[in-house]
Amino acid sequence: MEIKEISVPQQGVVADYMNGKKEIQSCFDYMLTEDAFKQRVQDLREREFFRQDLVAHLLEYNTKLQAGEATIQNVKALEDEDTYVVIAGQQAGLLTGPLYTIHKIISVLQLAKEKEESLGVKVVPVFWIAGEDHDMDEINHTFVTKNKKIKKTIFHDRNPKKASASESELSLEDCRKWIEEIFKTYPETNFTKDVLRFIDDSLRKSNTYVDFFGHLIMKMFMNSGLILVDSHHPELRKLEVPFFKQIVSKYKEVQEGLHNQQEVIKELGYKPIIETKSNAVHIFMEIDNERVLLEDNQRKFVGKDGTYSFSYEELIEEMERSPERFSNNVVTRPLMQEYVFPTLAFIGGPGELAYWSELQQVFHAIGFRMPPVVPRITITYIERDIATDLHDLQLQESDPFLNNVDKLRENWLSNQIEEPIDERFEEAKKEIIDIHKSLQQFVKKIDPGLSSFAGKNEFKINEQIELLERMLKRNVEKKHEVELNKFRRIQFAIRPLGAPQERVWNVCYYLNQFGLDFVDRVMEKPFSWDGKHHVIKL
């Protein structure tokens, strides 16, 4: 593996944040400097956390996932008042979801290690699985290449239920068939059988989406010390009850903080991402297997436009009786994370960084300071055959990141022809239409009854010219079919569906190609935190 960095243009909040623009950095409580991290440690030392109860739960949960010894030791280390966490989170995508989930975890592991060394305190890596999510459409699929096209392959459970990812039971038989279908689209390699066994071992131990995700991630990062937490685990929810109560008692301050911070964002020229009603309580309650967002309505807490209604006392009583029925929304999830964990740093993707810029005054409303927010490491893998294609087409490795691949293809094709086809045909059509318009005027003078036919005649002539243009382009493309296929392969590999590779492809493809130690070898590479994109040649 060979790694290099390239500068990829970014936009909006992320670009300005990474470029050190003071206006947007003022929307965060800490700069990404060593002094700021030292200050964060001091600030965390002044707060109290329910460490013993948290450790007891994390030990039980991670042991069930058959965590390695390094993970168990890291969990136990959290009992110490001077141990902190670097944390990130993601939904429980089947087969771990897109590559960026793996890259988030790599980011967490690397930053935790670096900060432990530089700050001289114990820092452990934590990955927060968003188990409360009910949107199965976001986690029940993966993308594959089939018949020279990118296909979205959806897992259809035979017994779908409206439930969270932590509670949605997987049909193991159906899931096994789905996995087999995915692997049929991969080339068979010396690693295929081992990877399938690796996956099936995790599947057999799982009952839910979160189980399957947790077992796979734990096996993949077995010796890394990574701690996993299911945000919707009933035992964790019990520990969170005091903070749920606090949110309910301060929801107006939370909403006001969000509104005020979004006004700041607007004044700086950015468009806010978070959309909420002015009466939102920012807590979900599970009612009849449905996740219902609570709202304030005349001193009552209501859901589904008043279908469900609770007094403050009733809501608090229900939280104490059934804490597993409650979960956070996009606004309060970061607050709950801050309440539960002594967070040295939060690692997020571009979208998360943008919406966290809207939360500063929300944190302050609860009496917290927002932790340092660190953009995750971004990675693209270039296989040997794709590197060869780039070389054959005289393209730089950075070209597909800085330019639209379709545009690169068009430019290359136009350079193979003496005169641009589009321009020549446009000129011809204009000249022919001008002549035909004059001819139509002549026809109209002599026989007005033929005016309509003359117009149709113009349309047919234009159709024939366009047909000739299409046939010429088709023949030119056929002549250069070998080279154009290289562009298609580059597009599929590096910018599938016009998106970054890490947002589409799944890690299982790379495990199948390069072995079960693929992720371990990636983690050995040096990554920087300067916002540059990392390209790894395989």
UniProtKB/Swiss-Prot annotation:
InterPro entries: Bacillithiol_biosynth_BshC, CC_BshC, Rossmann-like_BshC
Keywords recorded for this protein, A-Z: Coiled coil, Ligase
One Pfam family in the UniProt entry: CC_BshC
One Gene Ontology molecular-function label: ligase activity
Coiled-coil regions listed in the entry: 460-484
This enzyme's EC code(s): 6.-.-.-
Family as reported in the entry's similarity comment: Belongs to the BshC family.
Its biological purpose: Involved in bacillithiol (BSH) biosynthesis. May catalyze the last step of the pathway, the addition of cysteine to glucosamine malate (GlcN-Mal) to generate BSH.
Protein name per Swiss-Prot or TrEMBL: Putative cysteine ligase BshC
Natural source organism: Bacillus cereus (strain AH187)
Gene: bshC
